[in-house]
């Protein structure tokens, strides 16, 4: 069976998908390279919000946490519990990775509904949530793939690849393709849900600009949080699976 060509074709498909565009986009030209300016600008805004919130909340840590410090300690405890549940007792080193994924996606998703991106004019296109662009979701999914490959190899060494011939060598092609389709499912799930939510709100606002869009926006905030949780949970589950063996 042509397993290697098939895997190479799958990776090429992921690269091609990262170039998919919805609507017009604004680029920065740096030499011979085009930089996707919209994604970078909105991602920097999200990162600034996260870093600024953390700095403000813990700039004066107290033995008995109050207000912002208490909130971030609760968030950290939640992420630790999530990581431990999905990865197991060796979850500790992966808490920063899972936490970063969850918080970045969560704030990115909410920024699409809460921040007035549309009022900022660009030469081409318009600003939107970072996760509204498939380049962002594919990048996050590929980072997750690299993480679970690293987790498996660091735990088991080259014996990690034995999982591809279990329970029978006949399943080798399917087991290989499974690892390359995980990024596809993660990226499309997140991208599709966030894009659909923003499109629904835009359509309703254009049709009934006053009352009707408000409940839909609240529903969008709820589903955006759920999508961040699903992505982080699946990322942790994939890492745990690579460390424990193929199920």
From Swiss-Prot:
Keywords: ATP synthesis, CF(0), Chloroplast, Hydrogen ion transport, Ion transport, Membrane, Plastid, Thylakoid, Transmembrane, Transmembrane helix, Transport. Pfam families: ATP-synt_A (PF00119). InterPro entries: ATP_syn_F0_a_bact/chloroplast, ATP_synth_F0_asu, ATP_synth_F0_asu_AS, F0_ATP_A_sf. GO terms for cellular component: chloroplast thylakoid membrane; plasma membrane; proton-transporting ATP synthase complex. It is found in: Plastid, Chloroplast thylakoid membrane. PROSITE patterns: ATPASE_A. The keyword Translocase does not apply. One of its GO terms (molecular function) is proton-transporting ATP synthase activity, rotational mechanism. The chain crosses the membrane at residues 38-58, 95-115, 134-154, 199-219, 220-240. Its main location: plastid. It is a multi-pass membrane protein. Disulfide bonds: none annotated. Key component of the proton channel; it plays a direct role in the translocation of protons across the membrane. F-type ATPases have 2 components, CF(1) - the catalytic core - and CF(0) - the membrane proton channel. CF(1) has five subunits: alpha(3), beta(3), gamma(1), delta(1), epsilon(1). CF(0) has four main subunits: a, b, b' and c. Belongs to the ATPase A chain family. This is ATP synthase subunit a, chloroplastic. The gene is atpI.
């Amino acid at each position: 069976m042509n397993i290697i060509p098939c895997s190479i074709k799958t990776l090429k498909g992921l690269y091609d998908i990262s170039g998919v565009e919805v609507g017009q986009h604004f680029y920065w030209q740096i030499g011979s390279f085009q930089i996707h300016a919209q994604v970078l600008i909105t991602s920097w805004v999200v990162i600034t919000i996260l870093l600024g919130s953390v700095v403000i909340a813990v700039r004066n840590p107290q033995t008995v946490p109050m207000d912002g410090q208490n909130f971030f300690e609760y968030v950290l405890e939640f992420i630790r519990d999530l990581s431990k549940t999905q990865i197991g007792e060796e979850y500790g080193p992966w808490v920063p990775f899972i936490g970063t994924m969850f918080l970045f996606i969560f704030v990115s998703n909410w920024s699409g509904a809460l921040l007035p991106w549309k009022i900022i004019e660009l030469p081409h296109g318009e600003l939107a949530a970072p996760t509204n662009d498939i380049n962002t979701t594919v990048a996050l999914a590929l980072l997750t793939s690299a993480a679970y490959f690293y987790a498996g190899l660091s735990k088991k060494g080259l014996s990690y690849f034995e999982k591809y011939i279990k329970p029978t060598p006949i399943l080798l092609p399917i087991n290989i393709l499974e690892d390359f389709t995980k990024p596809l499912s993660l990226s499309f799930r997140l991208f599709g849900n966030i894009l659909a939510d923003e499109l629904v709100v835009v359509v309703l606002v254009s049709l009934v600009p006053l009352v009707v869009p408000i409940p839909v926006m609240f529903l969008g905030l709820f589903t955006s949080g759920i999508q961040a949780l699903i992505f982080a949970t699946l990322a942790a589950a994939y890492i745990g699976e690579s460390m424990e063996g193929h199920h």
